[in-house]
Swiss-Prot record:
InterPro entries: DNA-dir_RpoC_beta_prime, DNA-dir_RpoC_beta_prime_bact, RNA_pol_asu, RNA_pol_N, RNA_pol_Rpb1_1, RNA_pol_Rpb1_3, RNA_pol_Rpb1_3_sf, RNA_pol_Rpb1_4. GO terms for cellular component: DNA-directed RNA polymerase complex. Zn(2+) 1 binds at residues 72, 74, 87, 90. NCBIfam families: rpoC_TIGR. It catalyses: RNA(n) + a ribonucleoside 5'-triphosphate = RNA(n+1) + diphosphate. DNA-dependent RNA polymerase catalyzes the transcription of DNA into RNA using the four ribonucleoside triphosphates as substrates. Its EC number is 2.7.7.6. The lineage of its organism: Bacteria, Pseudomonadati, Pseudomonadota, Gammaproteobacteria, Moraxellales. The keyword Nucleotide-binding does not apply. This is DNA-directed RNA polymerase subunit beta'.
Amino acid sequence: MKDLLDIMQSPTSNGNHEFDSIQITLASPDVIKSWSHGEVKKPETINYRTFKPERDGLFCAKIFGPVKDFECLCGKYKRRKFQGVICEKCGVEVTTAKVRRDRMGHIDLASPVAHIWFLKSLPSRIGLLLDMTLRDIERVLYFESYIVTEPGLTSLEKYQLLDDEDYYKALEEFGDEFTAKMGAEAVQDLLKDIDLDLEIDELREAIPQTGSETKLKKMSKRLKLLEAFRNSNNKPEWMVMNILPVLPPDLRPLVPLEGGRFATSDLNDLYRRVINRNNRLKRLLELSAPDIIVRNEKRMLQESVDALLDNGRRGRAITGSNKRPLKSLADMIKGKQGRFRQNLLGKRVDYSGRSVIVVGPTLRLHQCGLPKKMALELFKPFTYNKLLSHGLATTIKAAKKMVEREEPQVWDMLAMVIREHPVLLNRAPTLHRLGLQAFEPVLIEGKAIQLHPLVCTAFNADFDGDQMAVHVPLTLEAQLESRALMMSTNNILSPANGEPIIVPSQDVVLGLYYISRSSVNAKGEGMIFATVNEALRAIGSNDLHVNAKIKVRVTETHIDDDGNRTKETSIKDTVAGRLLIWNIMPVGMSFDECNEEMTKKNISKLINSCYRKVGVKESVMFADQLMYLGFAQATLSGVSIGIDDMVIPPLKKQIIEVAEAEVREIEDQFEQGFVTAGERYNKVVDIWSRTNDKVAKAMMDNLATDKIINAKGEEEEQKSFNSIFIMSDSGARGSAAQIRQLAGMRGLMAKPDGSIIETPIKANFREGLTVLQYFISTHGARKGLADTALKTANSGYLTRRLVDVAQDLVITSDDCGTEQGLLMKPHIQGGEIIEKLGELVLGRVTARDVTYNDDAEKILIPAGTLIDEHWVKVLDNNAIDDIWARSVITCEIEHGVCSQCYGRDLARGHKVNIGESVGVMAAQSIGEPGTQLTMRTFHVGGAASSASVDNSISVRSAGQAHFENMKTVQHTDGHLVIVSRSAEIALTDELGRERERYKVPYGSSVLIKDEEQVEGGQTIAKWDPHTHPIITEFAGTARFSEITDGLTATVKVDDATGMSSFEILATRDRSSSAKDLRPAIILNTDEGKEVIYFLPAETIIRVSDGEKVAAGSILGRVPQASSGTKDITGGLPRVADLFEARRPKDHAIMAEMSGVVSFGKETKGKNRFIITNEDGEIHEELIPKWRQINVFENETVARGEVIADGPQNPHDILRLKGQTALADYIVNEVQDVYRLQGVKINDKHIEVIIRQMLRKVEITDGGDSNHFKGDQVEYADIKALNAKLEAEDKFPVQFERQLLGITKASLATESFISAASFQETTRVLTAAAVTGKVDELRGLKENVVVGRLIPAGTGLAYHKARKEKAEQKLQDKDLNAAFDMSATTDSKDFASFDEAFAQELNQGNH
């Protein structure tokens, strides 16, 4: 293997393979000439009679090299001995035919041609340099107008466009004092004339003076481009070509088909076109043809070169004979079928095969069954080797013959070869890393691959015709990696959430569940056994039924943290069958873990606890044994489905009759006009969905229990042994919803647009459906299938974007030493805790010391501790509410992440290793469940939304209440009224652990005091959900200002009470004279101050003029528009929106700074909202009038507080509240979507993606750097730059963190290779070429593209070693230089030499 690597690394004919970076630049005419081996002068390709390439044509052997190895075209020189000879007759060099793949030619263009990429790829680089519009440049290039290139002493301006008429006029007027040209020639001259240094200096002076934003943007763009040209040594005139390179002929082949036709690459057509036009143009110029003809020919040449480079970018695409657009050079590299994605990132692999999979229930977890035929083919070379080394064959040829005849010895050799040589199995689509795992092959007859049932979950495989691919790791290193890292036994835990993925399902669960269930009056009930073995013997001899309840003496072994073992014996009440499970459990587990009904959840818990307690090896063996036991017992249990198992509940008829009566009643009300059509529909749908639930409940109650006569002859109820119930209850197959359709009623169906059909299907499948019912149900079924197809594509695209943005994130060091982190709190929704603190911080490292609640000096957990299961218990027992934990987002390493900030590797259960590619892992973990998410937008309307309005808070459990952020006033009635916006009430238990937390709206009445003890179920706060109160915080006298009936207000009389009150009119409803009046209540407080409350439109005033009011009184109420039907984006589209950082429509408006609120003069459709802070700074913004503003005049708001409700805008959260708040928001929102589908993903994965979204910053002030306001720069670069500036006592750069969506972030990555292979290839490559960008090959993708080991996992060490070797070389070079210097010195120079040597050494070390 080492020799192989040496061969690969040895210098070959084309120089050394080793390189550290790749640069892309514009090619100058000289460079193109230097690549070329000759000029292509003729459009001919090959002679159709002799099939020999034409001389000077597109396939010319003289230019590009011989067609056959070591043979010239005319046949004078054949064979290897003439290598390097150039034939005198045909001019062909005698060499390998392979050179036709890399020898290029060129075409000398008769007139310059602009490169379409730099012209049309937006922003147009030529346009930006010349500071002209694209439209104008095109008019010049395509010969519509002249452009003045040299105005001389005339009144014309440089860059002025002249049409024919103007040009001839100017000629008459000025003669030849000026120069004006057209075509690419003119553009080339103008580009040549640009003095980069001068332009740059002018712009640098002009930029600080500009006031307008748009001008500033344009100027800084232009300046950037000019500097890029200056720094990259690209010359602007190179964007116009005088010489066109020709691709080597073997990369644009011409293949003869039968029948004398040829299949050819489209490029040949395109080149032929260019050559024809070029030759014609040369002839016309020699003949000095009329200007108009030459012009037309030049234009056609420009168009043909455009088509060759990028067909269809300008005008209509040129089509071939079959009406299809021809594939140009640009099309070759972009898109899914382009070079990047088809050939560089997705190669096909040798030594592989694929076949159908079948189940292998007798295999061990690390094995797979490989068909003999397949194994023989895959391991052929290895088998030849064994045959030779064992002397069974003398030559390779003989061995080959033996293998072809399939002689008996061959199989023995194959078995030896295969022994302990793992193979990789892969099932497409490979959505996460567990879709490719290593197994040891076991030779089997037949043609199908056998797969172990427990790995099906990871592969998402089933046996209904799925196929899988087999790959053979050839080298020793590859075999080692397969065994150590990819073996199925080393991948027990899922990388997404750290829980076991090797969990039995379906039949196995059914078998285990059956034997762990107890049954009354089973054979052997009540027996008592001295040992487990006795009981097992009784089961074996049929004296004891597996479902019988018995007592047995059990000996358990406990292992403590230090590995000490203690034994404990006790008598347990159990079910006989559970002893079968106990019998295979590893030593160190407790009996209670298997002494319960083995549902799928419990089995998963059992395997998880086994892994944590006794490690990988035991767990794998246990999982295998569980599977064998489950399969055997499922067979013995005889569970099967009969039609009588679907028991229809006797109550069903009665329940449905009641519902029908209710529906009739509503129909009557509708006919009499008491309810609207919408209300009727909502109520009917409501009734039927309630009815469906009632039927389902009756059915489940009926199914779930059996009545049975026990040993004493009494009737007692027990859990049912109905087959369908057993399957559903164990989690093996089917759900309550499916059983409901079999034996309950099918219920309401949806139309394809998602709306519900109000006629339900009252029948179930057992009763059978009528034609109409069947017809209704086809809607839903078909929509389901269509949805699935759509979902798969969308989910795949999301995964691709995620992988692309995160691919270069790798663990690069052990500790970055940061003290930053995120503050972790339990996740709370609707008052209850969904995720405990322990679950959130498990596997993370503490960023700061965790101290005791009652004593902040005493340290409970020191900073830098990895929190494992033991520490989680400590946290729970000490009632810790929040922890500062390290996070990927706050990691301070320049490239990659450090292992302390990442914490535990979820798939291995220990601290993450250096080199683990956490980025790709995160992307896969988030993308893989994507297909399980829904695609739909939820319409919450009518009955559903009206019920969900809360108007009070009742606590669930007893505890002590704590008020947070709460500002209250005491009302005269004694209760407190809240006058702050973000008030919360938290509830803690007797240990001080937070149990519940509630947000309390503004204006609520709080019915308890701070720190008061409350009972479970007690109401602690209430409010009116339909109005928004205006509350006074002071007592005093109310006085009306500008509130006049008919002008700014109207009098409303309440029908029920007969009381009248004022209602403020909206500005649009007032007469013109009253438009500018601002109705308000002025409160003269008892302290003698004046407080003004401005009243928004539609306020209903609750006090009268001159009335005395108490503190906490309500002055007025603003009705809340009931939020009708809102569409909630759910599922996959929601996740995509969050990661793309899209700004939601009508998003929440947040306070830009802390201060006091006031309202300025209104405009036509907007309110002027003003915040004044303590220093008197003012922030103004205009808010549309239809937005409901939550705050009133003179209220104090904090920065980032919500002023107008709506969906949150992540960019605002980042700007106003910082990155911790942003991380919390995105993590929680994404998790809510996944949680709804019951998918568990660790928060760390989402944080990894957020880190990548926060890579860039926007500069707000360039300081003493050469950056400008508005530049987008990498965060890491700016940090390094600022450190440097501060060290030199200069002004650092001021910047704001930016949040980029994942697509934008992928395209903005430092590596142009990675960006180009993702999307918008043309744009990325154009931008990179102009700036002469260097790709440092840091990420995974770039390295795959150039064909190196990736800098992750085992490849990271290889790259580190390479780097160290390079640095060593540099140091040696410096030393040698120092010694060379000493050779030329005199003895008296020795002192100075020593200094020089020391300096050299120091430089070398840096």
